[in-house]
């Protein structure tokens, strides 16, 4: 519930809300495109009418333009990301304290949907941990300060880098950017410190297999904080690929092309879903043929 992805979701919801009120702002191609974003915007309209409406010229003021839609080169991708970041900054400036409502509304709706879906699937989590809490309690800043005290941080080009190569990583990692913002890695370190400080015998991470390269840096950070790295375990989970009529179902969260667990359960039932997921070890690819 912290970081850029949540900001993008909040912005996407607000832009759809503006569109529902006749305010025409070009919707960024790299924002969240799914119909669920329109649903969240509609909920805002029902609850608050036009309270959060701002004029299009104010929203777009000072934002860099978008490249041609058919351009897929690296420069065009960077321009789209810069445009998105500028829109987020404008939203925060124009809405002021109301930005927190938009952000929280998007978070609450998606989190409630995830919780409900999992509960119906027979999966219950005792604790849901807030990433934002790591910042609100100052744990991220304390973590970076601890690493600095122990000599594991150096400054380069205005950014703070963790010497993760000293612990077997392929390169050092930024924990605080030159603009003062902390990276996702910094909050990951803080979260692991929190886990250890809660006194568990085992600290288990369940990650997607594409995060395999993340293990050395996290393990290195745990060692750098003088914590017992032997307690850290990482379980890698391969992707489940859905097939319908012999065709692979393409998925992209931002573009809105995906099949939810709820839709899958509705199509084949809870028992069949649970059976198929248990059919393979978590570190093996799963082809789920509908």
Q: Model-derived features: where do they sit?
A:
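NTP-dependent nucleotidyl-transfer catalytic core
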Residues: 1-290
